[in-house]
Amino acid sequence: MPNWCNNSVEIYHDDPAMIERVRTAFNGEGLLQEFIPVPEDLRNIVAGSVPVAEEAEHKLKEEFNRMTYGYTNWYDYCVNEWGTKWDIGADGNPAQDIPGGLLLGFDSAWAPPCAAYEKLHAMGFRITAMYYEPGMAFAGVWDNGDDDYYEYSGMSSTEIAETLPTELDEAFGISESVAEWEAENAEEEENIDIDLDGGVSAVNEQEQQK
């Protein structure tokens, strides 16, 4: 299973029909396939090894796809053209109306779909997207072509709060969650110290009674 990247996106367009198209796709089959579709030939080929008997045919299909689309399979296409390997959608959290656009909240596999944002931006969409991947400790803000990316591995909660933009930090509770982890870790270390002290005291008492 992949690490999941949390995303919060505001998306706007001057054409209301394009906004409705986003809503329908996001709440339905998937947003990225609607606007940046994976060619059918790439979707119908295995991204990986195949049985020996099928290798020759598989290689021919891969070469055809590479020459035609620039990619041999759906996985390579999605990672490069979308920025993530799977499509994104509501998954129980439908698009919300905001003045002039929509607010989208979703998880994406391993990374935010910034490559897709670039293509949507070229179609006339205005996009401000915040993302947060706790497993690899990175977060950022993609704002109409500019990507402010932050890595916070090894930082304290205080350092994170000082480094990340306030809106980004508060949107996902990043420094707050790290502060909770720090408090839990400190409590565990304190309990270990108490146990060790208790063990030493018991040993000393036994020695004195001999």
Task: Annotate each predicted stretch with a short phrase.
Residues M1-Q209:
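Long, contiguous binding/interaction regions
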